[in-house]
Amino acid sequence: MAPDLAQESKFNYAAHIRYWRRNLKTFLPHHYTGNDANRMTFGLFILSALDVLGDLPGALSAEERQGYIEWVYNCQLPEGCFRPAPATHFGAGRNEENKIWDPAHMAGTYFALLILIVLGDDLQKVKRREILLWLTKVQKPDGGFGETLGENGVVEGGTDSRFGYMATGIRWILRGSLEGPVDGVPDIDVDQFVECVRASESYDGGISEAPYHENHAGFASCAVSALHFTDRLPVPKPDGRLRGVTNLQGTLHWLASRQTLTLDEEDAIDTYKDETDSAATCHDAHSFVKLRSYPSTAGELSFQEKPTSHFELGWVGINGRINKIGDTCYAYWVCQPLQLLGYLHIIDRKPIRRWLLDRTQHVVGGFGKLPGDHPDIYHSFLGLMVLSMFGEAGLQNADAALCITSRARRHLESLPWRRELLGMSGAETSVQNPVGSYVSMSGG
């Protein structure tokens, strides 16, 4: 049955507060056991979610807040950077031989810094120089970044833009978008990183893990965010600096095309070996959209060949790849780069909001991946971030690139040491959106 468009979908504020406080104050369900090494990531999601909800002051006492800050610093390594969880902390037993099993970690460092910012720390105890030097060591010859350093300084980890996003995010937190050596510390090779992003851009504007791979909204989001942090997004007038997103109109079209009416598993049918499966039509997915119900009453009338005027869709999901089902997390991975590029307005937020609130919002709070799924920390946080970007009443404004509130970002930008560092070169403390209304969607 289609949604009643006259009935406003409701964000269950109280349930979300309870959900996130439970995640903060109690043991997580056993399903999270295999993610013990990701505690720093979960910590950021939980604390930032409470901040977005405006509940952080009420959820934490001053003593608890300080305790979490100390917990994060306990994960800082002697040589700089952070471990992603206490599990690899050897304490006094750590030595030159076994420290390879307790390495500096890209995600651990990025999320540790963000937690400290959300909690109002001044980052004075962060080994900033050591972290910035480490970033130059984990940059690969092609310009991308790894996850950690292995034996003999070999860069290890994936090859996609997630690590570039976190590396440039760390760099922006600690030194802004200044280029070149700062305070005697060398910089990463920004031009080479931009080349790496450009090489992963596809013919249709999407961005993939690596050249000639399948486009993916998550990689597009991370790449656009990294270009945002390095002030290398496209600008109306070339300024001589190498910039990414070389086909802006194509990228916007690809992102906007991730809107879908395939909202759950029952909306698709397997066509493998049926009459539609021929040499001309065969592909790897073997599925077509099947709507059990229509997105609106007017849509059903239109399908039955009855004349209708333009109608508003009831629910619209967002997927991350072509021919995939709508997924809560991809609402963030698509809307976030659109906002950073200055084009969030090219999608209709209303049916996306209804999809999130009517279909994936859970009765106990949080969001599931798909309709009917239990809520989890990852999807619940990203769903909340999307609603904040949409201006949901009762939610704090979010900084889409950093995944924290605008309040937390202002705290970072107010820190005296950072203002002094950036002022030394006359740099601005904030990265502004350089794209504006650079491109028209007509002809896309």
What are these model-derived regions, one by one?
Residues M1-G444:
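Preference for long, amphipathic alpha-helical scaffolds in soluble/luminal domains
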